């Protein structure tokens, strides 16, 4: 693995207008001839063309403008021979806002792939209420790799960069990373499960593909001490552990009391024999 390097599209020092805030906290890797860099406004046309080839989604122009210029998004590209061959787009947001937002359908065309709604209510159960009040979460909007470069670790490289970005001390408040995927997208499911994402919930008719509702999954990866809400079984295990701990403590105290009683009895007996 090569040393970590910073790659800029124009081979010039990054400017404040074309780089992401806090980009110095993101390890930008170079593996062989593949390098990672943040998107810049000049990437809009190329990224739009790639997304139209990779995904059957008709994103509005404003979406491409946002991910190539706004600091709201973590938008990272994998570059080979000056061409973008992979892309990850993610967003950090307060957990309490996850279910307050509604994402409009990307297109009215039946030939295009659109979401029926915003974040489903099932996503509200990603974190416990006590933790979620002050926690942030990372949401992966898009992760794609050019067909000719798949199975070469490009997707893992992009995801690792995001994970490293979210597990720094500055972002300890981010307790989970989650995403949505079609239940029929087996390659994506296999990829995320291999990367320690776990199935959180089933989303019936979450997607609209060519006018037909399609089911989706929510997958979650817990980081920075985050964990899912406790189930009844978790509570039972917790209290059982407390009982075992209490029983062990009682047994230890009983043993200590017995030792003290024996010592006191021995002292009394010794003193009585001495007096006689």
UniProtKB/Swiss-Prot annotation:
A GO MF annotation of the entry reads:
protein N-terminal-methionine acetyltransferase activity
Q: Where does acetyl-CoA bind?
A: 143-145, 151-156, 185, 192-195
Q: Where is the N-acetyltransferase domain?
A: 34-239
Q: Which residues form the active site?
A: 139, 180
Q: Name one GO cellular component term.
A: Golgi membrane
Q: Which reaction does it catalyse?
A: N-terminal L-methionyl-[transmembrane protein] + acetyl-CoA = N-terminal N(alpha)-acetyl-L-methionyl-[transmembrane protein] + CoA + H(+); L-lysyl-[protein] + acetyl-CoA = N(6)-acetyl-L-lysyl-[protein] + CoA + H(+)
Q: Where is this region: Required for homodimerization?
A: 204-215
Q: Name one GO biological process term.
A: chromosome segregation
Top-rank EC class of the record's enzyme: transferase
A Pfam family of this chain: Acetyltransf_1
Among InterPro entries, the record links this protein to: Acyl_CoA_acyltransferase (IPR016181), GNAT_dom (IPR000182), NAA60-like (IPR045141)
UniProt keyword Acyltransferase, yes or no? yes
**Record-listed E.C. numbers:** 2.3.1.259, 2.3.1.48
Q: For binding substrate, which residues are annotated in this chain's numbering?
A: 59, 141, 207
Record's keyword terms, sorted: Acyltransferase, Chromatin regulator, Chromosome partition, Transferase
What is known about what this protein does? Displays alpha (N-terminal) acetyltransferase activity towards a range of N-terminal sequences including those starting with Met-Lys, Met-Val, Met-Ala and Met-Met. Required for normal chromosomal segregation during anaphase.
Please state which protein family the record places this protein in: Belongs to the acetyltransferase family. NAA60 subfamily.
What this protein is called in its record is: N-alpha-acetyltransferase 60
Report the source organism: Drosophila melanogaster (Fruit fly)
Tell me the lineage of the source organism.
Eukaryota, Metazoa, Ecdysozoa, Arthropoda, Hexapoda
């Amino acid at each position: 693995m090569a040393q970590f390097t910073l790659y800029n599209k124009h081979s010039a020092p990054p400017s404040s207008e074309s780089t992401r805030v806090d980009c110095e906290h993101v390890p930008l890797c170079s593996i062989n001839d593949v390098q990672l860099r943040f998107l810049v406004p000049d990437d809009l046309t190329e990224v739009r063309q790639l997304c139209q080839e990779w995904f059957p989604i008709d994103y509005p122009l404003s979406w491409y403008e946002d991910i190539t210029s706004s600091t709201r998004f973590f938008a990272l590209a994998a570059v080979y021979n000056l061409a973008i061959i992979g892309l990850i787009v993610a967003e950090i947001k307060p957990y309490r806002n996850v279910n307050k937002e509604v994402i409009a359908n990307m297109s009215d065309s039946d030939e295009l792939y659109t979401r029926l709604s915003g974040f489903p209510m099932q996503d509200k159960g990603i974190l416990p209420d006590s933790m979620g009040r002050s926690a942030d979460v990372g949401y992966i909007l898009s992760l794609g790799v050019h067909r000719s470069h798949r199975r070469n670790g490009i997707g893992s490289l992009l995801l690792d960069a995001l994970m490293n970005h979210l597990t720094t001390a500055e972002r300890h408040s981010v307790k989970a990373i989650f995403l949505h995927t079609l239940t029929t997208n087996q390659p994506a499911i296999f990829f995320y499960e291999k990367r320690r994402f776990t199935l959180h919930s089933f989303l019936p008719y979450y997607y609209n593909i060519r006018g037909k509702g399609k089911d989706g999954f929510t997958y979650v990866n817990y980081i920075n001490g985050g964990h899912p809400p406790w189930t009844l079984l978790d509570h039972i295990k917790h209290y059982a552990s407390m009982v075992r701990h209490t029983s062990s403590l009682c047994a230890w105290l009983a043993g200590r009391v017995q030792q003290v009683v024996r010592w006191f009895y021995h002292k009394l007996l010794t003193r009585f024999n001495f007096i006689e």
